[in-house]
Amino acid sequence: MKQLKENKGIERSLLLTMAVIAGLTVANCYYNQPLLEMIRHDMGVSQHEANLITVVTQIGYALGLCFLIPMGDLYSRRRIIVINMSVAAVMAVFIAFSQRVWIVWGASLLLGACSVIPQFFSPIAGQYSEKKNKGRNMGFVLSGLLTGILASRVVSGYVGEWLGWREMFIIAALIMIVCLILTLKIMPQIDSNYVGTYRGLMKSVFHIVASNARIRLYAIRAAFSFGSMMAIWSCLAFRLAQAPFFSGSEMVGTLGMCGIAGALAASGLGKLVNQWGIRKLSLYGACLQLVAWTTAYLFGDTYMGLIVAIILVDIGLQCLQLSNQSGCIQEMPEASNRANTIFMTTYFIGGSFGTYCAGLAWTHEGWMGVCAVGAVLAAISLCITICCTK
């Protein structure tokens, strides 16, 4: 394992490994989405209670981002990653054998918290890549992460239909074991760059939030965009179970394939960060999401309308996430994990908020309410960008 040096470049094999593991680990947070209707029926709970599984998973991820990712500046990242993978595997097994929904909530919270591993990789790509390749390499890791998010829905949709929702989480546990072995074999040791205690480290995170307006801006507008995207996925299984579709989890998985092509565009978008700038990409991304939700509202009773909406909302999110996350890390390269913690914690709070609001909207107003929530969140992101010059 070659020792990494700041701004000196990363081997392609390590970059590829990080992208693959990023996709496989973040997938833990999204396996449940196509399976919500199956879980609801199996456990005899309401749609709102089933939707809370997705909500607590996102909250868990946000907690992991807030309290675990900063440790990458203090302790061995390799060791933290290995521990997280081990706990994630155990929690996936807990979910698979749970007979009560509250156990699923608790295990999902911890599974989400331990699935933050990709957020150790993005700072590595940003910190150790050559300056000319930073955006491209971060985009490459992001494409792996986004492909994992979307492919996880495809896989879980089909596995749920063919084998059952519990079997999907057993498979997830096995995947974590494989990732753990890969990490031990390929991931190099990276020296910590913070001298002090964990308490002091966390204080420095809050100091960065209070003192750096740009990082706050980058994080907040991306968070609203992520909330907009999560709105469509958190209620898609419920929508497809109704007229005129009457479809199961396998169709949710099939629609997930539509977003994969868009996710692969993230590596290409990385090149545009330097050319177009963060603000322009943020404007384009929010506008794409507004078009997506208009399409979902007007043509949401057709598969073609849903496909177009899914593709546009995903590409719009990528424009915002890649540009703003890159901006955060480059703003404070000496504290890359802490800057990324601020960005991604805010980001997933936005995702949890979007998921929760969409669930309430679905309960009271159906698909029209979900579209309204998604459009409002995208519009807020757009307004923030219009009002700011950064």
Model region roles, listed by residue range:
Residues 103, 140-187:
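Helix-loop-helix hairpin linking two adjacent transmembrane segments in secondary transporters
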Residues 2-9, 188-220:
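Juxtamembrane intracellular "pre-TM" segments in multi-pass secondary transporters
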Residues 107-143:
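Cytoplasmic helix-loop-helix junction between adjacent transmembrane helices
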